[in-house]
Amino acid sequence: MTTTALIIAAAIAQSTLLPAPPATQRQTVIEHATVHTAVAGQAALVDAFVVMQGDQVVSVGQGTPTAIDGQPIAADALRIDGTGRHVTPAFISSATTLGLIEVQAVRATDDTSEFGPFHPEVSAWIAVNPDSNLFPVARLGGVLLAWVFPQGGQVCGESSLVRLNGWTNEQMTVVPDAGTFIQWPATEPAPAWYASTSAKEQEKQRVKALRRFDDFFDKAAAAIRARTADPSLPLDARFNRLADVLAGERPLLIAAASAGQIESAVLWARQRNLRPVIVGGQGAEAVADLLVQHQVPVIVLGTLQLPRFAHQPYDEAYTLPARLVARGIRVAIACGDEPSNDRNIAQHAAMAAAFGMPREEALAAITRVPAELSGAADRYGTIAAGRSATLLIHSADPFEVTTSVTAAWIDGSPVQLESHQSLLRDKYERKYQGNDGASRGTTQVRPEQPAAVTAPAARPGVQSR
């Protein structure tokens, strides 16, 4: 690639929008809204309020707020009428590469993978691009937090939870070490006509891959024990990074997409006293008893998918979260798609809700549960007093495809809900407003929530179809 092409690619990958300003101590009161707190066991609150101050939620309840801890609401508080609107915690995009890649066809913008099969010392947050042009698009879809997974190899590296606001990746990082991500080898051969190896050869490769896992984790445990006994020994960054995982203090995130993969991965992890989390989930229902026995959560990679096999029903992916929840398994929902589509996370949860998953459970699958699994539940994922003021106001039911996010806050800071696409929309709406060209070029401000979007009038001399 030429130097000119690299410069153009780098320029395209930069967002021109500024990060949100720091939170102020002025109170913000959202009134008369339907509030979905995502707190376990709590239904949606109708005609409810949320009071924010600084970077925290200070009060949540029903009715009209008059005082907080005996102190009246400040006279200068910003009051927002939420009539007909819904308030939810910010959505969390799980198992994503958002911020690690910009344009898939431009390798210079791709920082998803490292060379080699084993690199647990790699941390996703270090490679996150704070100027990514995909962040504003994701924020418009309600995604204010991303659980970023590195890719490549068998032990891919350390995942990180980041907020989609900040000048630097250090400012954006919430949980730098949120679990080590590994790719579990396939357990069932693929006897398809396009397979490049025979079933017997695939079995040999599987055994070889499992042996590599055993050897690597055995060496890591031995190195950690040796250095604990004698701190003067040289530090191996790869093995040292697994210390918390081997101690069961951080989760081991295992990519597995079949019943055989999930079963072997869980048994292997529990034999080593690790905390497995399954990433993928296809086939999980077949081994649900094992997952319940060992309390293993599942991150389902997308519901807007076709069945993998011809014998499966059309709604196999749609109903998977509901079937797992019914068996007592904790479920998070991810897009399972390229990061430019993370904006659609609510529709993945909505599909699960439409096919049997309780609505509040579906909301929790993209808010509370990812926060719990990534180690940030003390601040994010729910709306409650003392939690971070990281939340959304929706124009209507958040699971309706016609609903839009009308306001958002990250740690109490109001978020600019604009993207390159929305700016172009506004530009051409202004261009074609009115029945003649007299109003073109005006600087009319777009209303926050238009009553309706109508087709632009035909230009003079142009026949409408």
Where are these regions (language model features)?
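His/Asp/Glu-enriched, well-ordered alpha-helical/loop segment
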Residues: 109-113, 121-122, 251, 292, ...
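Polyanionic/metal-chelating signatures
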Residues: 134, 139-276, 404, 410, ...
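Sec-dependent signal peptide recognition
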Residues: 1-10
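Divalent metal-coordination and catalytic microenvironments
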Residues: 33, 50, 55, 84, ...
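Active-site core of metal-dependent hydrolases
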Residues: 39, 124, 149, 227-317, ...
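Extracellular/periplasmic ectodomains of large secreted or surface enzymes and adhesion receptors
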Residues: 14-15, 25, 326, 407-465
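Acidic, glycine-enriched loop/beta-strand segments at the rims
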Residues: 17-22, 35-49, 61-62, 67-69, ...
